[in-house]
């Protein structure tokens, strides 16, 4: 759910009490060439030798997750880093898995962990280097790159992204010129010098993190570090890459959908579309023109029975916001269907655009016997003991076991119009079941994300029809294509790694 501007006026005290493909890298080749030349000039000047560091001076933090698939991928990356270090006959660096560092709900937001990094590593380390589990690192090149930057100074390094236009997911920040503010693409890796970590730690101790929403972490971290000009902006590093392997890249990131086994069968995925009478005429036809035919099991849940669609009236009155009552009725109906034991449930809005075929591939990496709650992760109040949740617009994916455990608990909506995705997040948090994040689900439209960010993704969903042609968006970004088939060879290699 995208939080409304005055959400706190809408939430009752009961809730408040609980709240404590496409564009290649080469399109920017001129800028990249300039950056690489500047890098090479720095190396020729001898600056890199002055800032000599070894691997022991770098602390690697893999932004991992506790789900078994993600934890395994992170462990494989850790082994790769340590093997490369051993091959260089250097003392092995510290390689940390984020999900193992702290039990607190908000560890994935990273800022709450900076004091730990400061206390533990500031004496003997120069850099904290963060990366995703699918980031690939060339350790010798990374060392060469970091040696260009004086580790006694405050540095915030990464591959720079910027908004193409003011966007709702960033609260329309820098609306006069959205391109001016740069933030890191986590997939390429990003780094903080220890002096900057120490400075941020002092700030965190003097002023606690605000208890509000975490929507796009990479943008929010960059804003916090920049501190309205009081801190350093992001320094773009051309060797931090998300394109295919190139001679100058210290990091790379491959664009493919995970495929661990055979794709999950369509009959094992039940799709529930939330709608209401007022949208039967404009939104439902879009679903039928685009992705409905991909779904083997699909039902439309409404406040009004219309046989031509057809819709199912769950007996829950429509609400202008929240839809918690409707969502929990869908969960009950899914679990209690006597004729089948479908492994997966997907709940989407009637203005969600989704690729079922790509979802089939992705779900091959997850065990429906585990409690899996998957989608795009947001957070609420994570600086003060809040919770994470899967935002509903991009689609919420549940394993049958997750639904079973949820409904076996006493956690329910406090009202029919409560925000369903946030209530689900609270419930799963209370059950000790972490949400699983996939950046391939999107709460907003393609135009709301940087082109360079989407260029290394195989997206599964987008959301909202506002000011776009949703049919064109679907066939441009999500429809099954020959390009999807061409990725099979890459995916075979991925399966072999697993």
Curated annotation (Swiss-Prot):
GO terms for biological process: brain development; camera-type eye development; cilium assembly; cranial skeletal system development; fucose metabolic process; gene expression; limb development; protein O-linked fucosylation. A motif (Prevents secretion from ER) lies at residues 495-498. Gene3D superfamilies: 3.90.550.50. Pfam families: Fringe. Residues 1-6 are cytoplasmic. O-glucosyltransferase that transfers glucose toward fucose with a beta-1,3 linkage. Specifically glucosylates O-linked fucosylglycan on TSP type-1 domains of proteins, thereby contributing to elongation of O-fucosylglycan. Belongs to the glycosyltransferase 31 family. This is Beta-1,3-glucosyltransferase.
């Amino acid at each position: 759910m995208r939080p409304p501007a005055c959400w706190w006026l809408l939430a009752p005290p009961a809730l408040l009490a609980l709240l404590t493909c496409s564009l290649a890298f080469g399109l920017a080749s001129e800028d990249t060439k300039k950056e690489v030349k500047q890098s090479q000039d720095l190396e020729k000047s001898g600056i890199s030798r002055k800032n000599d560091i070894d691997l022991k001076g770098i602390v690697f933090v893999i932004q991992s997750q506790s789900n078994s698939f993600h934890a395994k991928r992170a462990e494989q990356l850790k082994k790769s880093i340590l093997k490369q270090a051993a091959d260089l006959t250097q003392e092995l660096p510290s390689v940390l898995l984020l999900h193992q560092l702290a039990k607190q709900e908000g560890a994935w937001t990273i800022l709450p962990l900076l004091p730990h990094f400061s206390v533990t590593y500031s004496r003997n380390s120069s850099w904290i280097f963060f990366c995703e589990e699918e980031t690939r690192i060339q350790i010798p090149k990374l060392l060469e790159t970091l040696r260009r930057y004086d580790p006694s100074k405050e540095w915030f390094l990464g591959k720079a992204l910027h908004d193409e236009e003011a966007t709702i997911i960033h609260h329309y920040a820098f609306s006069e010129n959205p391109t001016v503010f740069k933030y890191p693409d986590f997939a390429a890796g990003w780094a903080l010098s220890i002096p900057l970590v120490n400075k941020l730690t002092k700030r965190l101790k003097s002023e606690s993190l605000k208890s509000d929403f975490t929507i796009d972490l990479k943008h929010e971290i960059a804003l916090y570090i920049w501190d309205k000009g009081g801190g350093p902006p992001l320094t773009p590093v051309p060797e931090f890459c998300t394109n295919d392997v190139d001679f100058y890249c210290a990091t790379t990131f491959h664009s493919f959908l995970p495929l661990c086994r055979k794709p999950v069968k369509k009959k094992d995925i039940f799709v529930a579309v939330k709608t209401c009478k007022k949208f039967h005429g404009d939104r439902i036809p879009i679903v039928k023109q685009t992705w409905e035919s991909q779904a083997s099991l699909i039902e439309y849940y409404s406040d009004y029975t219309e046989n031509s669609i057809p819709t199912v009236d769950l007996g829950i009155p429509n609400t202008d916001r929240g839809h918690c009552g409707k969502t929990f009725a869908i969960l009950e109906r899914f679990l209690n269907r006597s004729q089948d034991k479908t492994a997966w449930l997907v709940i989407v809005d009637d203005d969600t655009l989704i690729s079922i075929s790509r979802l089939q591939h992705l779900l091959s990496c997850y065990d429906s016997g585990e409690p899996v709650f998957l989608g795009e992760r947001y957070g609420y109040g994570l600086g003060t003991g809040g919770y994470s949740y899967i935002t509903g617009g991009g689609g919420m994916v549940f394993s049958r076991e997750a639904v079973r455990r949820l409904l076996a608990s006493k956690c329910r909506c406090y009202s029919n119009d409560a925000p369903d995705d946030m209530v689900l997040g609270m419930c799963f948090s209370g059950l000790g079941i972490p949400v699983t994040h996939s950046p391939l689900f999107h709460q907003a439209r393609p135009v709301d994300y940087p082109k360079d960010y989407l260029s290394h993704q195989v997206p599964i969903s987008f959301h909202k029809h506002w000011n776009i042609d949703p049919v064109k968006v679907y066939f441009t970004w999500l429809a099954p294509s020959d390009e999807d088939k061409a990725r099979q060879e890459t995916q075979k290699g991925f399966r072999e790694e697993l």
